[in-house]
Structure formats: C-alpha cells, structure tokens
Amino acid sequence: MTKQPDEWLDDVPDNDEEDEEIIWVSKSEIKRDAEELKRLGAELMELGSNSLDRIPLDEDLRSAIELAQKIKKEGRRRQMQLIGKMLRSRDEEPIRTALDKLKNRHNQQVALFHKLEMMRDRLVEQGDEAVAEVLALYPNADRQQLRAMIRNAQKEKAGNKPPKAYRQIFQYLRELAEA
C-alpha cells in the first residue's frame, strides 16, 4: 500500500516544543577565533608579572603563561598554541577587559605626560599668564616656587645650559597632577 502525499505528514512527529536553534559555524571562522585567542595569549606572554596579577587568570593558565615566558624558539610556539587552547575553554571576556584597562591606563599616562610637557613649555615661554592657568587647574600649587623654577629655566635656556630647572618644572607639574 502506498501513501498519498498528504499522509506523509502523519509520519512526521509533532514537535510542539520550541525548536532548538542550531547555529552553523564555518571551519574558517573557528580557525579565525582560535588564531585570535593565540594572539591574546601572545599579548599575555608579553606582560610582566605585576601586570599579570591584575588580570583574572586561573592557576593553570597563569603557570602556562609564565612557562612560555621562559621558553625560547620552537617550544615557545607550541606553548603559545597550548595557551590558545586553554583560552578556548575559558571565558575570555574578563581577560580582554582587564588587558584593555592595562593598555588604556598606559595610554592615559602618556597623554597626561604630553599635556604636562606642553604646559611646561607654555610656562617657560609665556610666564605669568601660564602660571595663572596652572594655578586655576591646580589650586594647591605654590606660585613662588613655580615662578622661581620658570626664571631658572629661562636663564638656563638663554645661557645654553643643561635644562635642569626645565625638568624640575615637569616633575613639579607631575606631582601636582598625581596629588
């Protein structure tokens, strides 16, 4: 006995439950993700122990990274692959977030130093106008000390002497910024 086309549907089980969504991932995408995790592992290998302390790593991963930092040549590559494999089985987001914070803090510090250098240059070139701006930014700054350092820096610049006072101004501004 042959079934009619409309009877074929009777053999299909009713699936009233929600169908599980199957997400198809290409092999190339899996490889790209694995390569990205290896790069993350390489970035972690470049960090010092103080920086690694600030990143949430479990003991196995931490010891694998420390071992990779000691290994040279071909063994290092294999260890990097192991670190990538270990990262695939862990949640990478907290690690990436902590790593980005470390990088961002360094960038912020560099930007602050550039700002302080420009402020120092303005102090030496413009004198009292720039001193007023510095005092507005940092009310706890000592006007007399700052003006004395500026005068010394201007004398050194005019006499082609080493910029000792110039560096002192920068150090003073840095102390004010960190306070």
UniProtKB/Swiss-Prot annotation:
Gene Ontology molecular-function annotations: ribosome binding; rRNA binding
Gene Ontology CC annotation, any one: cytosol
GO biological process: assembly of large subunit precursor of preribosome
Pfam families hit by this protein: DarP (PF04751)
Source species, domain of life: Bacteria
InterPro entries linked: DarP, DarP_sf
UniProtKB keywords: Cytoplasm, Ribosome biogenesis, RNA-binding, rRNA-binding
Compartment(s): Cytoplasm
Presence of the UniProt keyword Transmembrane in the record: no
Protein function: Member of a network of 50S ribosomal subunit biogenesis factors which assembles along the 30S-50S interface, preventing incorrect 23S rRNA structures from forming. Promotes peptidyl transferase center (PTC) maturation.
Similarity remark: Belongs to the DarP family.
Protein name in the entry: Dual-action ribosomal maturation protein DarP
Origin species: Erwinia tasmaniensis (strain DSM 17950 / CFBP 7177 / CIP 109463 / NCPPB 4357 / Et1/99)
